[in-house]
Amino acid sequence: MVDKIGETNTLCPVCMKTIKAEKIAEDDVVYIVKTCPEHGSWKVKIWNGVEHYKYLYEFAAVPKTPEKFAVPQIKDCPHDCGLCNQHMQHSCLNVVEVTNHCNLNCPICFATANGCGYDYHPDMETIRGMFKTVVDYVKSPRCIQLSGGEPTVRDDLPEIVRMAKEMGIEHVEVNTNAVRIAKDIEYLRALKEAGVDDFYMQFDGTKDDIYLQTRGKSLFELKEQAIANCAEVGIGITLVVTVSPNINLDHVGEIIKYAATKVPTVKGVHFQPIS
């Protein structure tokens, strides 16, 4: 039995035009069914478990529109680039890149740090301008993630955090590989005193053979030290796992069990799969 459970907009995978689609339930699986007048029809699986899919929609929040819009609507979403008036929701977490420098050279790197071919290490006034954009466009609560590269290579990161707080940004998260906060607890204390609320910490498993493949060196002991330091200082952590099918996919359960032993310092685990 096939039931229609909703409608949405999607893209033709051939011409990339925006087309209408139906969400259907069939054999306890949710699919999107779409047809492009020029290129035909597709049926795409999007979720296992119809009731679970519906249950998740109970958590949908009332959207908060942006304070203002940055660009005019020219075409339609997602073909325009920028914050146009089609955006019903303001930015929930604004990623602010403060460097492309890094103290690791990971075989797997989402930012291509140390290998992007140019140097990016903005001064304080440039960063102030980025923070002002967040304040101008985002309704409270304003949340940012300082990212890179590796933000903690900056000795002035506590000053950057303090500036964000003074400008009205309520929540400051730092994306980190944990190298510096494991080795330099006084630097960690300075970040805490400046106003860092939590760390988004790279964590690929509990065995060094995993890190040798994902990060190029043994790092598990360092990760444990970083967690211990954060527990001492009083800063929460989200463990961020790059999941590779050939490296640590079968280690996901062990990571969750490990994280549970580090509560309340570890607040959660975020899985980022790669193919």
Locations of the language-model features?
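Short recognition patches in nucleic-acid-associated and regulatory proteins
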Residues: 11, 16-29
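A short, sequence-level motif marking secondary-structure junctions
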Residues: 25, 47-52
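Short, flexible, mixed-charge glycine/proline-rich loop motifs
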Residues: 1-7, 24-29, 99
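Radical SAM/AdoMet-radical enzyme domain recognition
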Residues: 128-145, 154-273
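Conserved alpha-helical substructure of the radical SAM core
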Residues: 28-43, 47, 63-176, 180-186, ...
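Short, surface-exposed linear segments at secondary-structure transitions and domain or protein termini
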Residues: 50-60
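Acidic, low-complexity/disordered tracts enriched in E/D and polar residues
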Residues: 2, 8-9, 17-20, 37, ...
